[in-house]
């Protein structure tokens, strides 16, 4: 049976993931080059703004559950399943990496929804579902870009 502690762990994993993605998306926004520069530069900015919103919402939910959100880069990097960007990726590699990262997060969010549901925490489950829904659309659009 899942508990509030399990839900906080799930949410903190996502706080870590989104903080690493926030930095990675800035990296991509600054270092993207090539014929798709204008499109991707703008899209990466949209994505990092979205990431910032998720970070705040997830951290505040953890606080509402009387937990402690992760709050240092060291903690984020140790906990995240997302890797940092290198500043050396091509535009296509950046997009493919985001497809991979978002796909991995979709799976983690599904698992997190189950944990929250078992703990009777419909609010956290709903929050994770909303992020999941958005990421499925992002994966579809980014994958279409790569074709």
From Swiss-Prot:
Cellular component GO terms held in the UniProt record: cytoplasm
Localisation: Cytoplasm
Enzyme class: oxidoreductase
SUPFAM superfamilies cross-referenced by the UniProt entry: Ferritin-like
Pfam families named in the record: Ferritin (PF00210)
Residues that coordinate or bind Fe cation 2: 60
Gene3D superfamilies, per the entry: 1.20.1260.10
Keywords, sorted A to Z: Cytoplasm, Iron, Iron storage, Metal-binding, Oxidoreductase
EC number(s) given by UniProt: 1.16.-.-
Catalytic activity line of the entry: 2 Fe(2+) + H2O2 + 2 H(+) = 2 Fe(3+) + 2 H2O
Residues annotated for Fe cation 1 binding in this entry: 29, 56, 60
A GO BP entry: intracellular iron ion homeostasis
GO molecular function: ferric iron binding; oxidoreductase activity, acting on metal ions
Oligomer status and interactors: The 12 subunits form a hollow sphere into which the mineral iron core of up to 500 Fe(3+) can be deposited. Homododecamer.
Function: Protects DNA from oxidative damage by sequestering intracellular Fe(2+) ion and storing it in the form of Fe(3+) oxyhydroxide mineral. One hydrogen peroxide oxidizes two Fe(2+) ions, which prevents hydroxyl radical production by the Fenton Fe(2+) ion. It is capable of binding and sequestering Fe(2+) ion. Does not bind DNA.
Family classification: Belongs to the Dps family.
Domain notes from UniProt: 12 di-nuclear ferroxidase centers are located at the interfaces between subunits related by 2-fold symmetry axes.
Protein name (record): DNA protection during starvation protein 1
Gene that specifies this protein: dps1
């Amino acid at each position: 049976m899942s508990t509030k502690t399990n839900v906080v762990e799930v949410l903190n994993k996502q706080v870590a993931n989104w903080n690493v993605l926030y930095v990675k998306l800035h990296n991509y926004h600054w270092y993207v080059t090539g014929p798709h520069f204008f499109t991707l530069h703008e899209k990466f900015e949209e994505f990092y703004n979205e990431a910032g919103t998720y970070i705040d919402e997830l951290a505040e939910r953890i606080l509402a559950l009387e937990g402690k959100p992760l709050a240092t880069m060291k903690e984020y990097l140790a906990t995240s399943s997302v890797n940092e960007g290198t500043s050396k990726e091509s535009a296509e590699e950046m997009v493919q990496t985001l497809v991979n990262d978002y796909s991995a997060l979709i799976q983690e969010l599904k698992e997190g929804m189950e944990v929250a549901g078992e703990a009777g925490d419909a609010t956290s489950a709903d929050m994770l579902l909303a992020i999941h829904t958005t990421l499925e659309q992002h994966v579809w659009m980014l994958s279409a870009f790569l074709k």
